[in-house]
Amino acid sequence: VSRLDASGLFYTDLFSREEGLVSLLLVANPYSYKTMIDGMDRLVLAVFRQAPDRETEHWMWCETRILVLRVTVEQLERSLAGDDSPGLVQWLAHGDILLDSDGYLRALKERLETWGANLKERKLLCEFSQFAKTYLQSKQDLKDGQILDAYSHILASLHHWAHIALIEEGMHPELTVWVQMRNVNPGIYKLYEELTTNQETVEQRVQLVILACEFSVFTKMKSSCTLLLRLIGTRTEGWTVSELMHHPELEGLKLDLSLLLQKLAKKGYLREIAKPHREIGLGILELRYASAIERAE
């Protein structure tokens, strides 16, 4: 590897010519994180204010394969909150900042370490949404006699539950999540072992984990949905699902908002307010969601 590559000067020189560049990150020695950069030798993450013309490129230089990712600040923020890119936290933790014109990446890394700017609440909400959805799908699969599908979905549900437990402890989930869980939450780790290695039938194993997930969905609901409950509580007249979907705090997050609202309402954490909606049709009522504490006007 040349000195230019090792020092990052090669990449700095190339990308500094691109208009609107905010920050530049190089992951030069991926080691165990190589699978997170699609088997390439280097990852260059270039952050822009405006959407770039080319988002993903593969380069080769001196036998070194380079994955180039161009993202906007907004895309990066959404990915971090919604965990769309599981390797992103590791990239930021292990990468070298080559350019950072306004200190954005350094501030972002600090935010990750301190869980600032509602990051913890947003990640908990996203993980809980997926936790509840996959658990319910597994439960339905079991009713339909689709045992292997039920197994697949409850395994995914366990992963989201594990992520919730880690985030609650102030830890970022890694790809080796079960190594983390062995120390952080032996109970969830034991369920994972029961599901994957127990000698009982697949159906019996799935039933066992579904019962545990069902209890956890109800006990984790309020604390995991703090962000959503707080936003809804800012209006006495309530919110439509469309208004919530486009709220700046929620827009772009990977959420099954309809499922969350219904579960929260049935549990009594929210109220449904049915109001006539003449634009839709006579007799049609539009549902709005308000805090369970406030009274409707």
Model segments located where?
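Short, amphipathic alpha-helical interaction segments positioned at domain boundaries
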Residues: 281-297
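Short charge-dense sequence patches
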Residues: 40, 57-58, 76-89, 101-114, ...
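Conserved NTP/Mg2+-binding pocket subregion across the NTase superfamily
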Residues: 3-5, 62-144
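Metal-dependent nucleotidyltransferase catalytic core
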Residues: 1-94
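Conserved nucleotidyltransferase catalytic core and NTase-mimicking acidic/glycine-rich helix/loop elements
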Residues: 122-272, 294-297
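Short Lys/Arg-enriched helix C-cap and helix-to-coil transition segments
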Residues: 273-277
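General structural signal for secondary-structure boundaries
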Residues: 1-6, 72-75, 116-117, 200-205, ...
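Charged, low-complexity, helix/coiled-coil-prone segments
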Residues: 27-36, 68-79, 91-105, 167-175, ...
